[in-house]
Amino acid sequence: MKIAIAGSGYVGLSLAVLLAQHHEVKVIDVIKDKVESINNRKSPIKDEAIEKYLVEKELNLEASLDPAHVYKDVEYAIIATPTNYDVDLNQFDTSSVEAAIKTCMEYNDTCTIVIKSTIPEGYTKEVREKFNTDRIIFSPEFLRESKALYDNLYPSRIVVGTDLDDSELTKRAWQFADLLKGGAIKEEVPILVVAFNEAEVAKLFSNTYLATRVRYFNEIDTYSEVKGLNPKTIIDIVCYDPRIGSYYNNPSFGYGGYCLPKDTKQLKASFRDVPENLITAVVQSNKTRKDYIAGAILAKQPSVVGIYRLIMKSDSDNFRSSAVKGVMERLDNYGKEIVIYEPTIECDTFMGYRVIKSLDEFKNISDIVVANRMNDDLRDIQEKLYTRDLFGRE
């Protein structure tokens, strides 16, 4: 089967590699370097499984800048373009999704278009009306950055939103779900073909629950530090309850990354006509955590604050909406000199702060080293290290 994918970020590229094991897949992107990288079998993003599969697997995969070449004759066109949160509109910016749909329809008037980008509730119906087509369905992704292909190979569930009253479209939705399952290694995978709105909002609720869990354990940590208690002991006791579990429970400077901040804000906006307290509290409490972390650092009265890594996860190369950036902004408001150690940054400054290339120099000039996640590189400076990482994992 011929499949097109718009976007080569962690969603689009992981799907491309997954499906190219058994199908002819063409990826379109507007960035020439990414296209060349994929065609040279080098991953433009950090993902160990993607890097391995590009080198070791026989993939029927091609990347291109040419939409006519990509969309012609395909049966499915997957839209995996970014939908950042627009604070002025108070919702996702879906312009890239609509641009991709428009381009696809110019070159192919028969394929089924699958939106993989995260979107607001009601958007699929809205965009079907806007483009006067019944060929668009929605399939939420449940992927982790830097582990996107792994999560496609071992999916927790496959969800497709469709018009359940349209038997042909529902058939196409099931077929798309089977395409994803066919590329997976995991054999027993729940498949749920549901209404558009249910699929859309389930994605937002899933990520907001994860954000809530992050905030819960961060509040245990804040309480413990203020009261002089051992947060690890308390978290261990809490998590021995199998209903809670010892996972996703490591304190941090707050939730961040590409998905959780924007998805929680979108869900909060979706609740505008629905009574709620929790969703608003989750969004607000993440700001409170950053305020607290910044205050704890300022209390140590450092002249030079060293920020060790901007990335949210130790195996990631992305620091969009990183929690530590929020802490930096708060410290900057108090006039603190801030230096950064971040090997993924090639320039000498970032956000107006000096980037130190030498780890030894960084340690020497910093009065305090702030690390969202612990690393063995920092074991020799425990006396000036500030981290809330208790377990040495995500």
From Swiss-Prot:
Gene3D superfamilies with a match to the protein in the record: N-(1-d-carboxylethyl)-l-norvaline Dehydrogenase, domain 2, NAD(P)-binding Rossmann-like Domain
Entries under SMART domains matching the protein: UDPG_MGDP_dh_C
SUPFAM superfamilies, per the entry: 6-phosphogluconate dehydrogenase C-terminal domain-like, NAD(P)-binding Rossmann-fold domains, UDP-glucose/GDP-mannose dehydrogenase C-terminal domain
Keywords: Capsule biogenesis/degradation, NAD, Oxidoreductase
Keyword Hydrolase: no
Entry EC no(s): 1.1.1.22
Binding site for NAD(+): 2-19, 29, 34, 83, 118, 145, 258, 262, 320
Annotated residues for binding of substrate: 141-145, 203, 207, 248-252, 256, 313
GO molecular function, one term: NAD binding
Catalytic activity: UDP-alpha-D-glucose + 2 NAD(+) + H2O = UDP-alpha-D-glucuronate + 2 NADH + 3 H(+)
Pathway: Nucleotide-sugar biosynthesis; UDP-alpha-D-glucuronate biosynthesis; UDP-alpha-D-glucuronate from UDP-alpha-D-glucose: step 1/1
GO biological process, one term: UDP-glucuronate biosynthetic process
InterPro entries for this protein: 6-PGluconate_DH-like_C_sf, 6PGD_dom2, NAD(P)-bd_dom_sf, UDP-Glc/GDP-Man, UDP-Glc/GDP-Man_DH_C, UDP-Glc/GDP-Man_DH_C_sf, UDP-Glc/GDP-Man_DH_dimer, UDP-Glc/GDP-Man_DH_N
Active site location: 259 (nucleophile)
Entry's family note: Belongs to the UDP-glucose/GDP-mannose dehydrogenase family.
Function: Catalyzes the formation of UDP-glucuronic acid which is required for capsular hyaluronic acid synthesis. Directly responsible for the transformation of some unencapsulated serotype-3 SP mutants to the encapsulated phenotype.
Listed name of the protein: UDP-glucose 6-dehydrogenase
